[in-house]
Swiss-Prot record:
The gene is rpsP. It comes from Campylobacter jejuni subsp. jejuni serotype O:2 (strain ATCC 700819 / NCTC 11168). Belongs to the bacterial ribosomal protein bS16 family. GO terms for molecular function: structural constituent of ribosome. It comes from the Bacteria. Transmembrane segments: none annotated. One of its GO terms (cellular component) is cytoplasm. One of its GO terms (biological process) is translation. This is Small ribosomal subunit protein bS16. Keywords: Ribonucleoprotein, Ribosomal protein. The lineage of its organism: Bacteria, Pseudomonadati, Campylobacterota, Epsilonproteobacteria, Campylobacterales.
Length: 75
């Protein structure tokens, strides 16, 4: 199954996350199909950038959103 979830980037204690489309059987930081945005919780205010067009496409072909991505994209 295809999922849209976060993959961790950055360095120790300074993480940021890419919002990626991947197979659900892959590891968290394993290979991904497409990167559709990023999320940086370490700055004030939090920086969220998502390609809405690509997000809508992947949802239309059956990709599931992780809980965190669903809450981020609803903001």
């Amino acid at each position: 199954m295809t999922v849209i979830r976060l993959t961790r980037m950055g360095r120790t204690k300074r993480p940021f996350y890419r919002i990626v489309v991947t197979d659900s059987r892959k590891r968290r930081d394993g290979g991904w199909i497409e990167s559709i945005g990023y999320y940086n919780p370490m700055v004030e205010p939090e920086v969220i950038k998502v390609d809405a067009e690509r997000l809508a496409y992947w949802k239309s072909v059956g990709a599931k959103l992780s809980d965190k991505v669903a809450s981020i994209t609803s903001k």
